[in-house]
Amino acid sequence: MFEQNLTSEALTVTTVTSQDQITQKPLRDSVKASLKNYLAQLNGQEVTELYELVLAEVEQPLLDTIMQYTRGNQTRAATMMGINRGTLRKKLKKYGMN
């Protein structure tokens, strides 16, 4: 039986420095750095619905990529994501991807 051995450690961001050095770091580190940068730029301004903003920034490209990977097969995409097909359809509709 196949045992899935991938963890969040497998989700990495690859960058190339100005000295052409290639580095990889976990996606979560990039998200954290982006959030810190965003908050620093607020300059004391109030922000609301940050949770929804961050989810949308991650969820939409996730859905797009998974739908391309599965060639539009919603059942397979939902299974890969660990959600039911109805939830997937609702999310696709939310982002105008249906």
UniProtKB/Swiss-Prot annotation:
GO terms for molecular function: DNA-binding transcription factor activity; sequence-specific DNA binding. InterPro entries: Fis_DNA-bd, Homeodomain-like_sf, HTH_Fis, Trans_regulatory_Fis. Disulfide bonds: none annotated. Keywords: Activator, DNA-binding, Transcription, Transcription regulation. Residues 74-93 bind DNA. The keyword Transcription applies. Pfam families: HTH_8. It comes from the Bacteria. Activates ribosomal RNA transcription. Plays a direct role in upstream activation of rRNA promoters. Belongs to the transcriptional regulatory Fis family. HAMAP family: DNA_binding_Fis. Homodimer. PANTHER family: DNA-BINDING PROTEIN FIS. This is DNA-binding protein Fis.
